[in-house]
Structure formats: structure tokens, C-alpha cells
């Protein structure tokens, strides 16, 4: 049985015309980034001295104070090398809210709004996540998600509010010109599909996508929530 997509409808998301930045306990939250309802960039407070640093990577109370009340059920971690692009992914009948961050290296992380009832349907937003800036990106249910590795290697962690359902995978082309994602450092001409051949980073690193991710179609042929 499919799960109905939940809407993050608290006061944190009522004003979608401008980015609102608020400090909540040990986090600073930028809400509705890119003018897209529900997308948030979260920056934790880092307490450092000559020994190193300490930070809270997740605090349920701070999140609730920011108007974000999500029950996460699974944590995932991946390692990828430079030029790897993973995405754009979603689950159709079991949509996932994701809270993502890079714990090593540097990635460009992207979310595309696939909510049919959204005034920003088809709009994308991207943010650089790195071990240095320690930013986290909150992506509600109803979005396609992906990232590009810009460092030699990157370790990527994400919390999700529903489990992985392998028979429910969905995706869309990372390079669909109708969406027009501006992937940093990527050079190449659109071949009419999601195939990575002919694409590379500015330093000559070939773009690296899975076979599955090179078969996804564009926005017009993609599932809507």
C-alpha cells in the first residue's frame, strides 16, 4: 500500500517569497531556499579550539523549534570519487524526506520540485555541501534528488523518513534542458538523453553515472507527486 506524501505545513513554510534565516539552539536554518517551499539549508554551530571541534549533527528539539517535525527511520552513507553524479532519484509510492550532508570532501547537491500542486513545479535548487562548511540540506517528500562529487573523493550521509523500497525507484534525467540544472565545472553538449559520454569536469575528469541513471527521461515523462 502506498504512503500519502506528507506536507511540511508548519509556520516555517508559509512565506515562500523570500528566504528566512533563523537561529534555533545549535542550528541556523535558511527556509524556502530558492523560493521553493520546504527546502531548507541548515548550518550547525561548531565549537572549536586548539584540540579540534564539536558539533551536534542532529537535534530533534532544535528542528521542531524551527518548525520541522520529521521522524527519520534510516541513516545512509556512500563514498564516491570525483566526477561521480548520482541522480536524480526519488521513490514514487513511498516518498522520502532527506536530510543530507557531506562528511568528507565536497559535493554539489540538487533538489528538483516534482510536486504537481506546487507553484515551483520543475524548479531546481543546488547547494555546495562540504566537510568544511558542514551545511545540511533538507529535502521534503516530492522532490528528485542528486549530487555531483567535486573533490577527489566524498563521503555523503543522509537521513530518510521512510525505508528503501527497491521496487519503487524513480528518477529523471540529470541534464534535462527543460530543468536546466547548472552543474558546476561540467562541460559538454546535451545529446538528447541522460548519457554521460562527452561530459567532463573542467580538469578533464570524465563524468561518471550508473547505467540506470543514464536511462532516466526528462521532466515531461517523469512521475509527478
State each model region's role:
Residues 137, 145-150, 158:
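Short beta-strand His + acidic residue motifs that chelate non-heme Fe in jelly-roll/DSBH
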Residues 3-132, 151-153, 160-225:
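Non-catalytic, conserved peripheral segments adjacent to functional cores
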